């Protein structure tokens, strides 16, 4: 109880990391306390750590009737991890007025509007990408991020990958490489992250290193089709390069 109160006090003073530690200490004594889990999720949300916050919300409602407060918080976390469809589903008991106070139902309508707006921006980003309008696709992704005040660093992994590809297509190789390295450092065994690096190497005309990266991805996931196709492309480029070099040398010897 002392740790819980300390966590509440720290949260009120905007010391969110310390509040997380206090709630974690309290949860070691009451691991199934929905109140503590929701309190810690609020602290995680304040830190922009929506994945951890969502995990706490899911534990808080597991095996019990969820409160309106819990569903609202969960829906916001789902938006924070880029899952507007899930947020809309979570909000449905509040929107149908089957659960929650009138104030919670009003908040649910606001979050519902945010979820639908996020859906629209993501759909727009995909549509512009198919049209190869990389600038407008980037703007749409910016707008999707803005709903939950996300940055490229705090965005969901799938959005980070979208951003890297958009930066590549727009010729911003330095920014693309920086974000791709952040993704890779988070999980060096992730084949998607490895292939992002390979694409950047190819864009930098380092075909040999790009080929090696695709081979690494295939060692980790032999069935990865994207890596297989990319490897074939790199081999074809190296063959063209070798043929061009051979032709150049032959021409020089003829002279």
What name fits each language-model region?
Residues 1-255:
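Alpha-helical tetratricopeptide repeat
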């Amino acid at each position: 109880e002392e740790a819980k109160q300390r966590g509440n006090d720290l949260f009120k003073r905007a010391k969110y990391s310390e509040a997380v530690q206090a709630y974690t200490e309290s949860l070691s004594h009451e691991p199934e306390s929905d109140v503590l889990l929701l309190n810690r999720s609020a602290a995680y949300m304040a830190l922009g750590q929506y994945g951890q916050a969502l995990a706490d919300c899911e534990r808080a409602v597991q095996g019990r009737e969820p409160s309106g407060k819990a569903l609202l918080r969960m829906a916001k976390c789902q938006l924070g991890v880029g899952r507007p469809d899930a947020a809309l589903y979570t909000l449905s008991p509040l929107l149908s007025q089957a659960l929650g106070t009138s104030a919670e139902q009003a908040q649910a309508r606001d979050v519902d509007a945010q979820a639908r707006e996020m859906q629209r921006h993501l759909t727009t980003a995909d549509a512009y990408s198919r049209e190869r309008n990389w600038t407008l696709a980037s703007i749409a992704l910016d707008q999707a991020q803005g709903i939950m005040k996300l940055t490229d660093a705090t965005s969901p992994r799938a959005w980070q990958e979208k951003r890297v590809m958009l930066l590549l297509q727009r010729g911003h190789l330095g920014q693309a490489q920086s974000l791709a390295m952040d993704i890779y450092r988070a999980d060096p065994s992730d084949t998607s992250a490895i292939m992002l690096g390979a694409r950047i190497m190819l864009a930098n005309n380092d075909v040999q290193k790009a080929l090696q990266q695709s081979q690494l991805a295939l060692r980790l996931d032999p069935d990865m089709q994207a890596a297989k196709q990319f490897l074939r492309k790199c081999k074809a480029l190296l063959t063209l390069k070798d043929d061009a070099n051979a032709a150049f040398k032959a021409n020089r010897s003829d002279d």
